[in-house]
């Protein structure tokens, strides 16, 4: 026990504050913030506390008491805050408040004199421009003035509110919102004015349009007409006038001048007196034309066009590309003139029909977006009126249809340009290549035009219905038929338009157009562009490899047989005579004609040029000559049988004069009357127009009928002579053989050309095969009839064969046959055959 007390005493001595007791008896080890009670105890000072009230050991401490902590026994009062201090506390006024007494601190509520501080009064610039300071209890706020708002970055900075763009204005729709700094105004727009009794500026302003045109406030030139618009006005050219160069129309400063025709001149390099006179007359109309007489000018222009179409004069003799170029220029110029003159006419429909049935239909009315239907006897059209108006010309919109029926001369032999997609479709359908297209125009040429000329690609398609016109020569006539036109084999009904072509002057095309249907004598089309349209019947020339093979092989065989006939008639002496001469020239004509037919019958390119006309003329001459020589054979039979005792027939000179002279005369007269009849777009043969085919068909029919009469007479005479006891029985048998041969020859050649006359018809595929086969058999038949079946010719062939085989056999053969052959030669006339 004594040891423990000693150890505690030693520890006490080492602790801080441990001192020996003073003389008064107070402990010297009391902790900080405490005071001595006696020599062995201490007590914490006010505002501090320890674990026990009396501190008896130096290890205890006195900690500060937080009088302000909750629950607080201190009450500072309102608008104040309690602040704890070391061993005590203070009451201070809250931020935004200050004591009235001036003391910074106080101890209890009774000493509280805190009151609100007016920061707005102390610092008027607390809120920046366009802001107002508002004092609050203990603080302040900034409020923006009306028409302003705080910026997001700083709640003390205000900026202007644009009521016009934010939609916070109640302005009437007839006014214009004008933003001001912190406010806005509702003011009338330019060209508007407040309605009577309404102010101009406040938010209750209501405005109305000012009619500058009726009030005289406009500044339009005298060449224009004032048009009031909502809030403004425009100056538009008078009807029949156009803006001066470089000045836009429908502006306030627009200045206009009277419209004039564009210069009409023949295309470069085209020399035609008829065309020059026509263009001169049109130019005279243009110089004399006035806006007030637009209707009369339209009628006069159409009459001039009709005169040119009905009496083309030397235009008809121009080459097809030149005529097509003239057609292109004529149609384009007519559209421009009608477009210009139509704008001088009063609003509403307009129709004019010339004595030649050329018809013009116009529709003139204000802009809109409704569907409009207009039509005439030859065509009808349905379109959206917004398409007719366009964007360039603000005036009344114009749509027109100009139907010209008599354009056969200018558009003759025009070709159809098949685009690659159409070509591929046709070749897939017919499983063969397309060599060309034959066209037949079924309708008038209808030029469609609008107010503007930007019609290559329309916003919406236009519907057309074109009437079919009666046709007798492959082109459109004037009177509509009562029945529909049905396409035949390899034919198609097309809605085509005339397209400019630098090489051919112009051609038909179908891009952008499709046929929707055909009934009641008309065809309906839909097109996405405008031009001059027509309904065409296209006959596709599909390459027939079988027919081509038959033609080439068969004609080659025929030419070979004809060549054998020619050599036989020239070299076999026993058969020489007038009849052999006839057969020789007949074969020569057929040989030359077949050679030309094989080499040049097809017209490549579709244009009828000099080569094609020459081939057609030579074929015409050769085949006519062949029939003339065949008629001479009938004449020889007439002299032999009917007039057997009255001479020897015609001499060789007369035979050649008739056989070659008569065909030459026929061809010459035909060419002089209608030279364009030679050549067609597809084949180099006689054209069907104006009955030109009868220049061949007529003589052939006459020759066949005459020969038939001669042969009937010959057979009748032979029958009479055979019924008698006639000493010339041998000669009569020979005549009978000659007659049978001639009849067979006439039958073959006649039947061949009966089919051949129709070979070039569009639906003559079967007839073409028949004609080709018979034509290929002509040479072989003539060789069989006049050579192989002729006994004398066969004997000559044997001699030639023996001569080629060897001389001994030929000597033996001639010794055994010389006697009989000599007797036969003496017994017969030189002109007789030996069948």
From Swiss-Prot:
Skewed-composition ranges (Polar residues): 814-826
Membrane topology, record value: Multi-pass membrane protein
Entry GO CC: extracellular exosome; focal adhesion; membrane; plasma membrane; secretory granule membrane
GO terms of molecular function: calcium ion binding; G protein-coupled receptor activity; transmembrane signaling receptor activity
Ranges per topology, Extracellular: 21-552, 602-620, 675-691, 761-766
Subunit comment: Forms a heterodimer, consisting of a large extracellular region (alpha subunit) non-covalently linked to a seven-transmembrane moiety (beta subunit). Interacts with complement decay-accelerating factor (DAF). The largest isoform (isoform 1) interacts with chondroitin sulfate.
Stated name of the protein: Adhesion G protein-coupled receptor E5
